[in-house]
Amino acid sequence: MKAALRATGFQLEDIDLLAYPWSVTPRKFLHMNLKHVFRVLVLHGPGLAITGMRVIRDLMLPRLIAKRCASEMGKRLPPCDGVSHHLGHSACAYFTLPFDEAVVLTIDGQGEDESGSLGEWVGTSYLHFVSIYSPDSIGILYGMVTDFLGMRAAWDEYKVMGMASYGDPKRFEPQFRSLVEPLPEGRYRTHRTAMVFKPGYCEAMLKRLFNLAARTPDQPLEQVHFDVAAGLQDITEGVVFHLLEHLRKKTRSHNLCLAGGVFQNSVLNGKILCSGLFERVHIPPVPGDHGAR
């Protein structure tokens, strides 16, 4: 916050409202968390503690951040309000570009109850087209496979992206196609991602799917690991282009903005840029959660 004030020349007293890209309304709370509580409680009781911790964190985070900022600034803060996580991603992408209209696609693992959104900005007005709701999430699937390959989910996906260049995407294509289902109107569904927070679930499920033991971090990389990475990258690109083609048909805009953690995948971004679907493509310098703030 101090850096932002210095960069803009504003004082804290000039700010009317602080916006944080996380809005847990009662409806979103019920949709986002209770469905996981009931699913885990009925099917896998031991995982309930993990879900409970996520619920508490999500509800308390905006207040904790505001309290800490006030303490560090040494002043009373303006009102602090949460906005939809994917609206934050969308605004970050749009308001950092040099033109005044664009369609926007956001995709990540999960932000509140959404894992993606499609919409269009004209001036300062936003028209929302489609939301994709967790647990349908190509971002979650990418993290699951990253973990299966012996790396850290939500951290090492870039390594898996690099590994994909050395693999054969056809080897595990049927398995990945069984996990992802394109749907009409710019939607898709991911199968077997609902229980991602249950300890041990992802490893066991992917082991059966690929007929392959999970790699440990100290295990040498083998060709089969590169082939899994290639299949994952290929299905991810397919999902994204499915959504982009819907956007292209729905609007006349030639400008595209992209945001969310999935668009830290530079190989994917390069293919979008070279596809010719849109004349101009803009990705903010930090498309992940840090850029949504």
Where are these regions (language model features)?
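Short acidic/glycine-rich loops and adjacent helix/strand connectors
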Residues: M1-R293
